[in-house]
Amino acid sequence: MIKLNKLLISAFVLSASLLTGCSNENTITVCASELPHAKILNEAIKPILKEKGYNLKVTVLDWTIQNSAVANDEYDANYFQHVPYLNTNNFEGDKELIAAAKVHYEKLCLYASDKDENKKLDNGETIEIVNDESNIERALLLLSSYNILEINSSCYKKDGSFTFDTSNPNSCVTFLSGYKNCSLTCILESNLCVSLNDYNFGVIPGNTALTGLGDDYASRIVLSEKTTEETISERANIIAVKKSNKDSEKTKALVEACKDERVATYVSNTFGDSVLYHYEDLLTA
């Protein structure tokens, strides 16, 4: 009987937590990465939604489980990824997610470790890059744009899509003159900042650098991603929701709040050139 009561209590607590989350019509629940996402939500978007009669509840969650959390109705939306990542980490059927709005763009940069005080990439040095396919191509394109390496044709399938062997990254690139003996190592994104000092340099996504390198992140930047309006739009971080919730009032309110010029001002004043405000309403696109 005691065991049964415990089970019933657990079920009630779970049901109650769900009801206070996605089911509360005046509360919008969003899971997000800590920086800059949760900070933008709490400090810029939350006050705007409050004016519209909504309470925004933000939970910092590991990025690897945010899509499944929204797909399983634990949250109304998430905010951590760009469209290319969502395209390779989505669900099918009634759990499918869609991009509701683009909000900001984070520059991908090459950061120097403590090993490299002159902050200049030279021949024979080691470079760590992220190991998820949607960001590997981006890291290689950054290095290619500064004539550090060429991406071999073997990295692209016949249909033009990118493919990469994370266990043997150097087989997919050719380092150019002056960098011939450099080498790449693929590292789990959550470990990039921790392991940076094991290498000379690291190509690290913006939110990971902001969180993991702290106030020191800007002083470590060696090279920044060269951007165009097209690349910014393609890699802008999004609000993602379940496809079945596309037309919900909560989704519409959240997307509309992201458009407010106060969000743009906040992002610019808080993060400078590291994070660029870029809004696109994808619900009406």
Model-derived features: positions:
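Ligand-binding "clamshell"
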Residues: 88-100, 113-116, 198, 212-227
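C-terminal motif of bacterial Sec signal peptides marking the signal peptidase cleavage site
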Residues: 18-21
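A conserved helix-loop-strand patch within extracytoplasmic ligand-binding domains
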Residues: 100-150, 264
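Short, polar/charged alpha-helical segment
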Residues: 34-57, 65
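Periplasmic-binding protein-like
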Residues: 135-146, 256-279
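A bilobed periplasmic-binding-protein/Venus flytrap-type ligand-binding module shared by bacterial periplasmic
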Residues: 107-118, 234-253
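Short, well-ordered beta-strand elements
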Residues: 25-35, 54-59, 126-127
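Short helix-initiation/N-cap motifs at beta->coil->alpha
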Residues: 58-68, 156-194
